[in-house]
Amino acid sequence: MTTKRTYQPKKRHRSRVHGFMKRMSTSNGRKVLARRRAKGRKVLSA
């Protein structure tokens, strides 16, 4: 029996855990977005 790959991508899970709405819902998440804006990231969140 072999171990499975741990990354099984799902669009819904990705956006719910790391998405923009999730980031905006907490104060620390807003800090993350602010940092990424300050750094000049093209993509702010998943």
From Swiss-Prot:
Pfam family, one: Ribosomal_L34
Region (Disordered): 24-46
Biased composition (Basic residues): 32-46
Keyword Ribonucleoprotein included in the entry's annotation: yes
Keyword Aminoacyl-tRNA synthetase carried by entry: no
Alphabetical list of HAMAP family matching this protein: Ribosomal_bL34
Protein name per Swiss-Prot or TrEMBL: Large ribosomal subunit protein bL34
Native source species: Lactobacillus acidophilus (strain ATCC 700396 / NCK56 / N2 / NCFM)
